[in-house]
Amino acid sequence: RSRGLGDVYKRQTIATAAENRVLDQPAEESHTWVYDYRWPGRRGAAHCADIPMWFGTLGADTADRQVGPVTTTNPADPTAAVLEDAAGQTTADLMQSALTHFIKEGNPGWPSYNDLTRICMVWDEKPHAEMDCYKDARTTWGLS
């Protein structure tokens, strides 16, 4: 898919940060986790569009402009909302569970990023772990 210049630099920044974190770490000691947010929403996976998904603020003002149509689940509380797209709501639920796991356990519940596997979590219609999802940025910028 075609990427805008901002997306190219964002990917390069993430790849650089991840590579620098694991540079001198044995793979089994890695405490680095990387994700790639690809939920299409209304405007694609724009910068910060993942925040309502991570924090469950789907009913917040303007959140639906990023993540897609939402339905209020409690008329007394317009911020209580779920995505109308079932796959999107499942993705949001899984993202919130990963964040909670990270806070409680010190890891998000998916394999850590290391210089051997470079695993990252892909948040899209079918969330999954993927090997080296930032390979394009890593190799383009000569990171390894």
Give names to the regions the model predicted.
Residues 1-9:
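Single conserved hydrophobic/aromatic residue that forms the stacking wall/gate
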Residues 14, 18-144:
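Mobile gating loops/cap/lid regions near enzyme active sites that modulate substrate access
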